Amino acid sequence: MEQIEKTVPACSDKKTVSVKELTYEFEQTYIKNKKRGNQAMIKLMKYLKKSAGYIVLIIALLFLQAYCDLSLPDYTSKIINVGIQQKGIEDSVPDKLRDSTLQNLQIFMDEDQKKEVSQNYTQKDDTWVLNDDISKETRENLNEDFSKAMMMVSAFSEDSEQGQAMVAQMGLPEGTDPLTALAQMPEEAVQQIMSQVDEKLKDMPESIVTQAGVSFVASEYEALGKDVDAIQMRYILMSGIRMLAMALVIMLAAISVTFISARVAGRLGHDLRNSIYRKVMSFSSREYHKFSTASLITRSTNDVQQVQQVMAMMFRIVLYAPILGIGGVIKVLNTDSSMTWILGVAVGLILIVIFVLFQVAMPKFTILQTLIDRLNLVSREILTGIPVIRAFSREKHEEERFEKANLDLTKTNLFVNRCMTFMMPLMMLIMNGVSVLIIYSGAHAVDNGTMQVGNVMAFIQYAMQIIMSFLMITAMSIMLPRANVAALRIDEVLKTEVSIQDSETPVHPSESVKGEIEFDHVSFAYPEAGENVLTDISFKAKKGQTIAVIGSTGSGKSTLINLIPRYYDVTKGSVKVDGVDVRDMTQKELRDKLGYVPQKGVLFSGTIDSNIRYGKPEITDAQVKEAAEVAQATEFIDTKPEKYKSPVSQGGTNVSGGQKQRLSIARAIAKDPEIFIFDDSFSALDFKTDSQLRKALKEYTKDATTVIVAQRISTILGADQIIVLDDGHMAGIGTHKELMANCEVYQQIARSQLSEEELA
């Protein structure tokens, strides 16, 4: 991947890159890495295996939430249709009816229907009561039987025009009950009338049949003295309570999903950070140079946070949106399929709006992080370089640089935000337009009797839920590209092959050999470098000896000692410690033998005591004090009020350079290793402290091997062997006197630093 660091333009004026050029460059990189980013995101999913149970629970809760969400419009529909329009009476099956009414209804029933009614009703005096244990299927059959019969009874009632016309047609006296006349007719004649009614009912909307039956039942209840208003209120209240219960379940499910999603995403972030940390800790110097420190920090914090946030949202939105959308479509088809074309129009318009906005805004959106990185880079350079900027009076120039980076980011942010501000108003316009269109079409359906008002209201709510599911997925599609980039950057670290690895069959040094170092014809070249930094270096140091390395800047001194702790592997030859090739030992066993003091003293946040104990936490307070005394650190430690418990800030910024070096030396001494390595670790000390330290150190380390890299000859005059490096080659090896006699390079260094009296 072309890392974001690489896309950030250089800060010099000659290499300033315009936003337009940066947009094109990032687009090409984005297209090239989009597939790899998706693959990286999928690879990171393996970290979710630990949370498989939680994920199953999340999916179950989302189904529960969606079920309740999709049930609410249905309850709203029932409150309007049944509770308000039908006075709380759900169908044409009366709970109770008079014997006379049943006899009238049975006129229009066949023998099977009469039998089914008699089986499911019990006569009590002059009324019939519905049994409590009837099945849903039986109730549906009874509803169908009663609906037709009730329509016929209403149609041929004494007050109806149709009933009076039939009486006149049959030549019966005026005032004769039409139903009494029908009861006296032959069964064949009644069945003929019923056949004609069935033909008409086929073309009649179901809602009209239902309304007729419900009206009949309501009239019957009133005749029996039942309070229909109480039935209506009870139905509305019970439906309202069920809706409140559904809303409570939705709330609890949503809270649970959010909580569990945050937990799963948090565990994912924790595991990713741990994996990155363990991977980075296994890096050799070669891998450290591949990734900058700032980049590794960003990858283990911001990038992990980006993936973590998207994963939490993915559980709540990406999984929920399809469940809600598909469920909404099923509910719509069950409600009324004649208006589904409206949903097709709405979804089409939404997709067009999203496509246009993404085409316009996405190229700018994808470079936002790059522009932020560029602003951070400029800010960091300015803040760290303030003394130099002031010294050269370049404040105005740096202000212009910062202003340009800031303006580029601001313009791009404004452009993206302006584009995105159009999304919600357009979506609201589409949603409101869909609502108007549904109401318009639904009004015609209600007028024609093919649909009820409650169904229209439910259809609107289902349509909004389907549209919202598309909006949720759209919102995620904005965040996913950034998460993919973050996942790819994390994956780059995790899949990096570590060049320095322990041998599968490690060799352990003999206890009889300690503190021995041997370079056997060692040559070394940095990865991807054409020339050797070190060539054919050979020497041997035994226990108790002091080996010094000196040479001009860039001669390979630090590189040479970095081969001992195996920060790099040699290109040719071998480095042996205690008679074993360092490549055959485990890194831990090798480094446990070493006490390393780097060129730049590194301290950790904590106290002076914790820093000295860093290599060997179990040492006593007396050993801590002894290490500080040898390192000449007690001079400033004793002046502090808290002495060894004095705080040390991150990086040791609250101590001077010389104090930092002395504490670093004390840390190595406290470890009591077999081999001490000092990489120009006395450079920040004055001559007096340097002399006292070398004297104390020589006494303390007499049983250990000491390797010293130095710039000052005065530091290494007493060394048992001095190795002189010149452009990666050994120009000489021996004591100070031997080198003064036969090594020209050493002589030049000595004459440049020492007076004639000191040389004599």
Residue ranges and their predicted role:
Residues 1-72, 76-243, 249, 253, ...:
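Membrane-integrated ABC transporters
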Residues 2-5, 10-11, 15-18, 24-32, ...:
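ABC-type nucleotide-binding domain
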Residues 24, 84-91, 98-105, 110, ...:
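Short intracellular "coupling" helices and adjacent cytoplasmic loop segments at the cytosolic face
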Residues 56-67, 244, 248-252, 256, ...:
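Generic alpha-helical transmembrane segments of integral inner-membrane proteins
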Residues 175, 186, 193, 285-286, ...:
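An intracellular "coupling" helix at the cytosolic face of ABC transporter transmembrane type-1 domains
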Residues 257, 282, 289-318, 340, ...:
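Extended hydrophobic secondary-structure segments
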Residues 327, 331-348, 352-354, 359, ...:
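Helix-loop-helix
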